[in-house]
Amino acid sequence: MTSLSRPCVEFISTILQTVLNLGLLCLGLILVVFLGKETVHLADVLFAPEQTSKYELVEGLVVYFLYFEFIALIVKYFQSGFHFPLRYFVYIGITAIVRLIIVDHKSPLDVLIYSAAILLLVITLWLCNSKRLKRE
């Protein structure tokens, strides 16, 4: 088996990084469109003449923040030299579980398990922000 030369490896790495960057750029643009659609939907729910469920409004707000967090994650990826900070994934996980609790809160045991998962993610976030693991 022959090993690739250093310039060849760097060329392949550059091409793959460019493909990844273009894919994330497209994903970011798609998320901006969905964020705009969610803004319009929230305005419709908020200003609807009929009585709407408060859960629907809160669920829409949490989905809005999920879109926002994913867009912020992509922006941070480009700002930090093509690397994803771990804590942004933890933020997204916490927000997603909060949304799940709002949408599906029928079983008290499930809510307790989801809450324990949030506690675990908050502890993870605390550890990530400690001096030993902090990179930024």
UniProtKB/Swiss-Prot annotation:
Name of this protein: Protein PsiE
Family in the record: Belongs to the PsiE family.
Keyword list, A-Z: Cell inner membrane, Cell membrane, Membrane, Transmembrane, Transmembrane helix
InterPro entries according to UniProt: P_starv_induced_PsiE, P_starv_induced_PsiE-like
GO CC list: plasma membrane
Transmembrane segment boundaries: 15-35, 55-75, 82-102, 108-128
Lineage: superkingdom: Bacteria
Disulphide bond pairs: none
Compartments (UniProt record): Cell inner membrane
Membrane topology: Multi-pass membrane protein
Main location, first listed in the record: membrane
Gene behind the chain: psiE
One of the GO biological process terms: cellular response to phosphate starvation
Signal sequence interval, chain numbering: none
Pfam families according to UniProt: PsiE
